[in-house]
């Protein structure tokens, strides 16, 4: 849909129980409907929700009507000719009258079925001032489509969108380009065929001249053998040159492939070496089962009881769900060891330096215990990835 070019604004008011065509004029233009909204002023006192339906003529049926019309025209011509040739004798009036009544009833039922099959009906949406006021849509209607809208309920529904230009409208240019391409290709193929035919004619004519100069039958046979060998030699030379060319291409491609593979191998080795050279995080088990894992070692003095520290952190549950974080703005500041935070933080942050990064896994008794908080169930083990950014 993004390829369509908007030309102008489209709007249509569909009043209750009044079928309204999507296009009121015969200009061949495509429309794209993107929004439906309800008018809060009711048409009656029932104040029922309004349902928008789209009614579309069945394209298969219209195509069938076209063929049926041609067949009916042919039948009418045959009937007129048969009437001119001879009058049909009258038969039993009673039996004919009964058959006519049955036939008319069956035709009426068939007409009703055809009317039902002629149109396709589909519910698009239902809106009400008490609930939903509007609904986004994305419906494109081509100019050749016979489409109507009808509303059942107590409120008018307004449709809005754009008149758009379809990308396939400029197909004539591409057709001309294709014709030019094929005409050029045919002409080039024709020239190549003519050149090959001229070469063959020259070879045949030269061979004929040589044979005319020979009188003896044995000379002719020997000359024919020479021509055949000469032709085979040419073919073999062509094959050899082609094979040599392919071998040269393969050899030239091999160094490039080797270079690519060596570069990839070197990169993989560097990544592997860098990963292996990285020191593994040090894990320690502290009081109450608290686990700390130093990811980055900071510089300067270590945090201790009474030190005011500024922290960045991301708090996660055991299933990996993030329940709290401080990654930008003002850092979270508290005094270490004074009970301003959960006990797991007072124990887990101690010993860090500025710039240090650490993972702290805190069992439930050293976090919030049996207390349930928003986003944190009771008896939850918490994991914090923390970074010490300031210390006083």
From Swiss-Prot:
Residues 58-116, 161-284 are annotated as: Disordered. It is found in: Nucleus. SUPFAM superfamilies: FKBP-like (SSF54534). Residues 306-392 form the PPIase FKBP-type domain. GO terms for molecular function: macrolide binding; peptidyl-prolyl cis-trans isomerase activity. PROSITE patterns: FKBP_PPIASE. Residues 220-234, 252-279 have a biased composition (Basic and acidic residues). The modification Phosphoserine is found at residues 80, 82. Residues 73-86, 104-116, 172-219 have a biased composition (Acidic residues). GO terms for biological process: epigenetic regulation of gene expression; maintenance of rDNA; nucleosome assembly. It is an enzyme of class 5 (isomerase). Its main location: nucleus. Present with 14100 molecules/cell in log phase SD medium. PPIase that acts as a histone chaperone. Histone proline isomerase that increases the rate of cis-trans isomerization at 'Pro-17' (H3P16), 'Pro-31' (H3P30) and 'Pro-39 (H3P38) on the histone H3 N-terminal tail. H3P16 and H3P30 are the major proline targets with little activity shown against H3P38. H3P38 isomerization influences SET2-mediated H3K36 methylation thereby regulating gene expression. Belongs to the FKBP-type PPIase family. FKBP3/4 subfamily. This is FK506-binding protein 4. It comes from Saccharomyces cerevisiae (strain ATCC 204508 / S288c). The lineage of its organism: Eukaryota, Fungi, Dikarya, Ascomycota, Saccharomycotina.
């Amino acid at each position: 849909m993004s390829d369509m070019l908007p030309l102008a604004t489209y709007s249509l008011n569909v009043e209750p129980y009044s079928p309204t065509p999507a296009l009121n004029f015969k200009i061949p233009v495509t429309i794209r409907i993107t929004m439906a909204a309800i008018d809060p002023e009711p048409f009656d006192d029932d104040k029922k929700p309004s349902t928008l339906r789209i009614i579309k003529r069945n394209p298969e049926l219209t195509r069938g009507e076209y063929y049926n019309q041609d067949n009916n025209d042919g039948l009418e011509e045959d009937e007129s000719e048969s009437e001119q040739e001879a009058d049909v004798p009258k038969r039993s009036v009673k039996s004919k009258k009964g058959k006519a009544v049955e036939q008319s009833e069956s035709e009426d039922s068939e007409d009703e079925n055809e009317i039902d099959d002629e149109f396709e009906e589909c519910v698009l949406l239902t809106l009400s001032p008490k609930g939903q006021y509007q609904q986004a849509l994305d419906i494109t209607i081509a100019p050749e489509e016979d489409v109507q809208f009808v509303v059942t309920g107590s409120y008018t529904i307004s449709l809005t969108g754009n008149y758009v230009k379809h990308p396939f409208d400029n197909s004539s240019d591409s057709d001309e380009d294709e014709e030019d391409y094929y005409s050029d290709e045919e002409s080039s193929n024709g020239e190549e065929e003519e050149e090959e035919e001229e070469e063959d004619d020259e070879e045949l004519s030269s061979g004929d001249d040589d044979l005319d100069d020979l009188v003896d039958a044995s000379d002719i046979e020997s000359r024919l053998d020479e021509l055949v060998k000469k032709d085979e030699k040419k073919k073999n030379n062509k094959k050899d040159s082609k094979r040599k060319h392919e071998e040269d291409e393969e050899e030239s491609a091999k160094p490039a492939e080797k270079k690519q593979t060596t570069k990839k191998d070197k990169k993989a080795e560097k990544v592997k070496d860098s990963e292996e050279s990285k020191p593994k995080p040090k894990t320690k088990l502290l009081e109450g089962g608290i686990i700390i894992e130093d990811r980055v070692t900071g510089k300067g003095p270590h945090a201790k009881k009474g030190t005011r520290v500024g922290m960045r952190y991301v708090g996660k549950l055991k299933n990996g769900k993030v329940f709290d974080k401080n990654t930008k703005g003002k850092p979270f500041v508290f005094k270490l060891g004074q009970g301003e935070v959960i006990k797991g933080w007072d124990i887990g942050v101690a010993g860090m330096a500025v710039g240090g990064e650490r993972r702290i896994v805190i069992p439930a008794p050293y976090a919030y215990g049996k207390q349930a908080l928003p986003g944190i169930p009771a008896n939850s083990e918490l994991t914090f990835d923390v970074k010490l950014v300031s210390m006083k």
